[in-house]
């Protein structure tokens, strides 16, 4: 059992209030997931730089800043608790190579031109306060509260999962064919950091989006993803909700003017 939430703003006048609204939604889902929490915020930023969301819990900010500056040219580096948002023109292939060689204890939790992801073990109320979610602005956001069932309670095991540029996924449910699907995706070049079935679903969607649009990808998912689930998958343009055909996991969708 987990809690998933998402909000998309029609009016730019409300963008400064996005974090406050998403905070309330996450806290209200606390009883469905007390083990960990996380959220993804999409911002309407017109820049050519990539933004990399990194968890640096095993290294001090000053040490990381000094060492990473020797490896790549940084546009900006902003600290938020044990996460940082790194802005640079360097492409994901370069960043992944640098992290794998020089910073093996630093975790890349998401990247893109718009998305910022923060997630951590702990009570959702504490996670919201830790990252000061109330102060975030943006166009849309999704969040997750986790009750662990099939994998460890770790930051890497927390949602959202991001396996593609400006893409992320949160999930309530369980997949029964994630091990077979994981093996197929690894053969196609996907890399996974946890044993969580949700990360496999995120990898499936990212892999499928190479050849299909989001709507067709999700339709294919109904055939390829076996289990009971409700997903929210986020992109730079918005997000979509997918439920299995039996639909035993609840989802409430509302729209206002």
Role assignments for model-derived ranges:
Residues 1-257:
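Conserved short alpha-helical segments that host acidic/polar catalytic motifs at enzyme active sites
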């Amino acid at each position: 059992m987990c809690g998933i939430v998402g909000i998309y703003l029609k009016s730019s006048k409300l963008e400064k209030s996005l974090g406050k609204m998403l905070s309330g939604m996450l806290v209200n889902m606390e009883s469905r997931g007390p083990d960990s929490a996380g959220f993804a915020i999409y911002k309407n930023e017109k820049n050519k730089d990539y933004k990399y969301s990194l968890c640096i819990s095993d290294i001090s900010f000053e040490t990381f800043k000094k060492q990473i500056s020797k490896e790549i040219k940084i546009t900006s580096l902003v600290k938020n608790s044990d996460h940082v948002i790194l802005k640079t023109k360097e492409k994901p292939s370069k960043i992944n190579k640098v992290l794998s060689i020089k910073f093996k204890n630093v975790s890349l939790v998401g990247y893109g031109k718009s998305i910022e992801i923060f997630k951590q073990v702990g009570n959702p109320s504490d996670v919201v306060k830790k990252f000061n979610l109330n102060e975030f602005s943006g166009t849309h956001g999704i969040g997750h509260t986790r009750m662990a069932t099939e994998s460890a309670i770790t930051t890497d095991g927390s949602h959202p999962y991001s396996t593609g540029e400006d893409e992320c996924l949160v999930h309530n449910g369980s997949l029964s064919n994630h091990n077979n699907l994981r093996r197929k995706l690894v053969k196609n070049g996907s890399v996974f950091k946890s044993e969580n079935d949700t990360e496999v679903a995120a990898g499936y969607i990212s892999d499928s989006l190479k050849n299909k649009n989001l709507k067709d990808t999700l339709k294919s998912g109904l055939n390829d993803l076996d289990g009971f689930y409700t997903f929210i998958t986020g992109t730079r343009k918005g997000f979509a909700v997918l439920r299995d055909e039996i639909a035993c996991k609840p989802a409430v969708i509302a729209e206002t003017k």
